[in-house]
Regions:
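Conserved AMP-binding/adenylation subdomain of ANL enzymes
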Residues: 1-31
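Generic structural signal for well-ordered beta-strand positions
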Residues: 3, 143, 196, 202, ...
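Short acidic/polar active-site loop segments enriched in Thr and Asp
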Residues: 1, 30, 53, 235, ...
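Conserved AMP-binding/adenylate-forming
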Residues: 22-25, 34, 53, 62, ...
Length: 322
């Protein structure tokens, strides 16, 4: 039996936690699925979820603090899963919340977000970053161990094409001939990531949202933003690039927590100090406070509209440590 709570499904971040709990208690809900934005609502509300045995959250990375708080609200034997995938291929990989929390320090120092080990049946490989179409698979596309590249997946749930969208199909699909002479389609996720030594996949952000500073420096959103999100006054942040790709200026746009009345110049200075703690974040010199809530996707309310924020940042008078 599926229970649909009293909420606007296009605005999970605005859901009333009291109504969510009312539905959970009335029907004795044991399994819960929701976007990270909905998890944030429940975590902030802070009421125990006594009947829930399994939680699944997908659509965007779940902040470590939200994972920790949700586990505190669940029964000790309950599980919290954060699967990784896309409409074109789901699921790709999965990790349980407790393992994710053991990796929190790595996420908050620039490793990216661990999305777990590939699901059985999937062949997940990392290829060199390119915005061009790739017609046929070649092992020469693969990056070295531990290097960041584009995540690709071949498996039973990967789609072969987009309906009546030949250009998009060419950019997202690679034809691979197997040793037995058969062929399969490899899907390019459009995400950047890498594998650690234990076979776990790490998500580093969308390929289209990477910031290319120069030929030697590319910054990935999920390797930069979690470092700054450790600031106690920040609700979230977004790395954006201003200027042409290949010569972009990295800018960190940030949103303060609701109700916080802070000197944004001081906050920006504190963020600059955080940036200086790591080589990759040291490239970020400009910080902009966004006075309104970030633009987000209508479905999950968790995917940040970085393209819109980049356009907004480009219109601001940017200076170092603004």
């Amino acid at each position: 039996t599926s229970i649909i709570p009293d909420m606007d499904p296009t605005r999970p971040a605005k859901a009333d936690p009291r109504k969510l709990h009312a539905a959970i208690e009335r029907f004795g809900v044991t399994q819960l699925f929701g976007s990270p934005a909905l998890m944030q609502v429940l975590a902030t509300h802070g009421e125990k979820l006594a009947t829930v045995k399994r939680v699944t959250s997908a659509g965007a990375p779940v902040p470590p603090a939200v994972v920790q708080r949700m586990l505190e609200l669940l029964p000790p034997d309950a599980q919290l899963w954060t699967p990784y995938g896309a409409t074109e291929c789901l699921p790709v990989a999965v990790i349980e919340g407790r393992e994710l929390l053991t990796l929190r320090a790595r996420t908050e120092t620039g490793a990216g977000t661990c999305v777990g080990r590939p699901v059985a049946g999937n062949t997940v490989r990392i290829i060199r970053i390119s915005d061009d179409a790739i017609g046929d698979w070649d092992d020469a596309l693969l990056v070295g161990a531990g290097q960041v590249g584009e995540i690709t997946v071949a498996g039973p749930s990967a789609t072969d094409s987009y309906f009546n969208r030949d250009a998009q199909t060419a950019l997202a699909k690679i034809r691979e001939r197997l040793a037995d002479g058969s062929e399969r389609i490899v899907h390019r996720m459009g995400d950047l990531g890498w594998f650690d030594g234990e076979g776990r996949l790490w998500f580093c952000g969308r390929k289209s949202q990477r910031v290319v500073v120069d030929d030697l420096t590319t910054l990935c959103t999920e390797q930069v933003e979690p470092v700054f999100n450790t600031h106690p006054l920040l609700l979230r942040s977004a790395l954006v690039g201003v200027g042409e790709k290949g010569a972009q200026r990295p800018v960190l746009v940030y949103e303060l927590k609701p109700g916080v009345n802070a000197d944004v110049a001081e906050v920006s200075d504190e963020l600059r100090h955080i940036a200086e703690g790591f080589v990759h974040t040291g490239k970020v010199k400009a910080f902009l406070h966004h006075p309104n809530p970030f633009p987000v996707d209508i479905r999950h309310n968790a995917k940040i509209g970085r393209e819109k924020l980049a356009a907004w940042a480009a219109k601001q008078a940017i200076k170092d440590s603004e």
